[in-house]
Amino acid sequence: MVMACRVVNKRRHMGLQQLSSFAETGRTFLGPLKSSKFIIDEECHESVLISSTVRLLESLDLTSAVGQLLNEAVQAQNNTYRTGISTLLFLVGAWSSAVEECLHLGVPISIIVSVMSEGLNFCSEEVVSLHVPVHNIFDCMDSTKTFSQLETFSVSLCPFLQVPSDTDLIEELHGLKDVASQTLTISNLSGRPLKSYELFKPQTKVEADNNTSRTLKNSLLADTCCRQSILIHSRHFNRTDNTEGVSKPDGFQEHVTATHKTYRCNDLVELAVGLSHGDHSSMKLVEEAVQLQYQNACVQQGNCTKPFMFDISRIFTCCLPGLPETSSCVCPGYITVVSVSNNPVIKELQNQPVRIVLIEGDLTENYRHLGFNKSANIKTVLDSMRLQEDSSEELWANHVLQVLIQFKVNLVLVQGNVSERLIEKCINSKRLVIGSVNGSVMQAFAEAAGAVQVAYITQVNEDCVGDGVCVTFWRSSPLDVVDRNNRIAILLKTEGINLVTAVLTNPVTAQMQIKEDRFWTCAYRLYYALKEEKVFLGGGAVEFLCLSCLHILAEQSLKKENHACSGWLHNTSSWLASSLAIYRPTVLKFLANGWQKYLSTLLYNTANYSSEFEASTYIQHHLQNATDSGSPSSYILNEYSKLNSRIFNSDISNKLEQIPRVYDVVTPKIEAWRRALDLVLLVLQTDSEIITGHGHTQINSQELTGFLFL
């Protein structure tokens, strides 16, 4: 499919130009307010609606070497983390342009690779100061209560980015005690604790709301003043005196204040809202799925003696296009769709526990397990004329049915494909066969129902059959949930099964894939936050810290002696050391420009700024303040603590108290940075081998430009 084309200068690094072109197509997917795209096939003129970077790349022509490398990097990030893909693609483009600028200024390739790699490593170390511990999330959770409060939250999209002023923020109906217990506090330089959500109020609206919210503020401050201020998750805040210098490469000093209050998150709803990035409906389903898993773990373990771990491998989705979005929900058990021809079978089985058989491979006549060697020179002789008239598949299907009847099996789950002929016979005998079942579902039913998975139906015996499975319609009126493919949704469950299914519905079929992608993105964000027990202060704070630190390093490098600059890289040649002193500030500034473009685009995509230039000017103002402070991390944390700060709020609704903090996952974000830079540097070094070769000198003038089709 073709989206656009771009002029490519063949005398420049073509691979870097191609990376920039590919990345340009995904700019609108950066940030919480994404703009969808219609991709039109140039051959059949069919269109596809997409709203994510992964789906975008699936629709582009990536047959070139650079396109394949980009696709591999994106797929690796998506298959592992399911988040951070838009960040990866954008930084690939931004840093490709940065490298091109470095080459244009004559910076040696080895210097570019060394300084950019070290610069990113330095940023990865610095952002540790913005970690927020996630502990004891489930300690105070009621195992008998199902949360549905997430839908009432409206999240602040970003410290730099905020909800437009006309956004309707719905009040969270918690008592003062609940609000106080869930509100996180920090202290400013004077030591006065402040509510975390005060950070988002504009100065013009502080005075107007001062009287109406004074009672709530006093109650919260009284509760939080008693909390001890200790930050143990950052090397910047473990000093006993007020300010202390922390050693950095090239003499970079981090002056911080020891009076900062520790940011913590110990509430599941708050964490889920912070990680939703504006997609409240999807995160609400994820949060309910976690709650159901927690309830099941409490029942199985008895008072939850073991720490609860969110198992994302036991979460599944069932997409039902054509139904209203209000039908989306989360249910314990396994929900799937079957043909409406199974309707009489479901009605027959729904009022009784059924016995189950689990088949690992295909349930077809010709299926053989992996590694099977067919015996040679063997012929089958049939001595019955009646059997000869029947097909071999008919004989096989009859045999399978006899096995099911013998062991009184009414439900068969198959991991692979199922013979259509067998399905027909089973329907006639009131037996349900379901194919293409996920392996984790098979394992869950094996554990809960006591069944044993087998490769062939001939291996079934009494010990392999499970029991106690309930089969029913997902809704009491099955005809109300028939999708456009003439299928109905059914629910399979048994006592103690560790399975949760999110039913995703949408009246627009074209948006069904988008809804499922967003659900899994939210699920993996919450999964990694709980797994790592830490998150970032999100919404641009981390990238702003990287931008600020790199600018400070670049400015300090200009003032350093050559030997001091070369001390950052050890065991290098004298040529590299001397070149490093000359070019290092330039490379660091271009690397930082990638973060500047990232934040500017993020701001522009929220529609709070009329142009990226205006957004960039806004960021530049705070960048100067952070640089002048000498401690970017302290500047960011101090701005969080200020009641009237504008670095983390633009024009925002006056309903302040409903706006919680925004978070980012740690490892997926950093890995997206690393993959982006690794890809750019790989293409850079590959291009250098090709362009500096003999063939480059023979390029004709009329071949200097060309078109890159995307």
From Swiss-Prot:
Transmembrane segments: none annotated. Keywords: Bardet-Biedl syndrome, Cell projection, Ciliopathy, Cilium, Disease variant, Intellectual disability, Obesity. It holds the Pfam family Cpn60_TCP1. It is found in: Cell projection, Cilium. Changing K408R: In a patient with Bardet-Biedl syndrome compound heterozygote for BBS2 mutations; uncertain significance. It comes from the Eukaryota. One of its GO terms (molecular function) is ATP binding. The keyword DNA-binding does not apply. GO terms for biological process: chaperone-mediated protein complex assembly; eating behavior; fat cell differentiation; intraciliary transport; negative regulation of fat cell differentiation; negative regulation of stem cell differentiation; photoreceptor cell maintenance; stem cell differentiation. Changing G540V: In BBS12; significantly reduces the interaction with MKKS; shows significantly decreased interaction with BBS7; the interaction with BBS10 is not affected by this mutation. One of its GO terms (cellular component) is cilium. InterPro entries: BBS12, Cpn60/GroEL/TCP-1, GroEL-like_apical_dom_sf, GROEL-like_equatorial_sf, TCP-1-like_intermed_sf. Changing Y524C: In a patient with Bardet-Biedl syndrome homozygous for a mutation in BBS2; uncertain significance. Component of the chaperonin-containing T-complex (TRiC), a heterooligomeric complex of about 850 to 900 kDa that forms two stacked rings, 12 to 16 nm in diameter. Interacts with MKKS. It is linked to Bardet-Biedl syndrome 12: A syndrome characterized by usually severe pigmentary retinopathy, early-onset obesity, polydactyly, hypogenitalism, renal malformation and intellectual disability. Secondary features include diabetes mellitus, hypertension and congenital heart disease. Bardet-Biedl syndrome inheritance is autosomal recessive, but three mutated alleles (two at one locus, and a third at a second locus) may be required for clinical manifestation of some forms of the disease. Component of the chaperonin-containing T-complex (TRiC), a molecular chaperone complex that assists the folding of proteins upon ATP hydrolysis. As part of the TRiC complex may play a role in the assembly of BBSome, a complex involved in ciliogenesis regulating transports vesicles to the cilia. Involved in adipogenic differentiation. Adipocytes derived from BBS-patients' dermal fibroblasts in culture exhibit higher propensity for fat accumulation when compared to controls. This strongly suggests that a peripheral primary dysfunction of adipogenesis participates in the pathogenesis of obesity in BBS. Belongs to the TCP-1 chaperonin family. BBS12 subfamily. This is Chaperonin-containing T-complex member BBS12. The gene is BBS12.
